[in-house]
A protein has these predicted regions:
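Hydrophobic packing positions in regular secondary-structure scaffolds
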Residues: 1-178
């Protein structure tokens, strides 16, 4: 039904549904077909859905929606994610790493440091941070390098191995040159 109802009407209808039902609807939707609804839906209604999906560990669904969610809403919803590892899990399912990179550079230094700390607890997370950082400009890569060094200077050397193995070293030149 949600694809066949005008987006503004669907957003008004959603105000009458509870978070659990909204999360069930989200699980059945195709994110690219819900883009207009994501634009119209008030972010306050999305907060509860975000918490529901975090609770049920629906990272793959959240990552898919991140590709189409307006960035200003994504920044607000990121406040609902307390565990940096959950942010990395969601990011790993997002296809548009350029969007994740733009969201990441808007974070404060403390938030990014927590992501870096979480990333170095799992090889998959290190790769994810590398993929996102590779989408950043030189200035932001240098910021990531500085923050990485503040967390642990050995992290950059460890990440370089991942970058070589995944063909990212050239795209991360500014990160390693810093």
């Amino acid at each position: 039904m949600s694809y066949y109802v005008p987006a503004d009407r669907a957003a008004r209808m959603c105000k009458h549904f509870d978070d659990e039902f909204m999360a069930e609807i989200a699980r059945e939707q195709i994110p690219e077909r819900a883009k207009e609804q994501l634009e119209k839906l008030p972010v306050d209604l999305m907060r509860g859905v975000t918490r529901q999906m975090l609770g049920s560990r629906d990272y793959h669904i959240m990552g898919g929606f991140t590709d189409y969610l307006p960035e200003e809403k994504a920044m607000i919803l990121m406040e609902e994610i307390a565990d940096p590892a959950d942010s990395l899990r969601i990011s790993s399912f997002a296809q548009r790493k350029d969007r994740i990179a733009r969201l990441t550079v808007k974070m404060d230094d403390g938030e990014i440091k927590r992501l870096i700390e979480a990333a170095f607890k799992s090889p998959d997370f290190i790769r994810e941070v590398g993929l996102v950082t590779a989408e950043m400009g030189a200035k932001d890569q240098q910021r990531m390098a500085r923050l990485s060094d503040e967390v642990d200077p050995a992290h950059r050397a460890r990440s370089r191995e991942m970058a070589k193995a995944n063909g990212l070293e050239e795209r991360l030149q500014a990160f390693y040159a810093a």
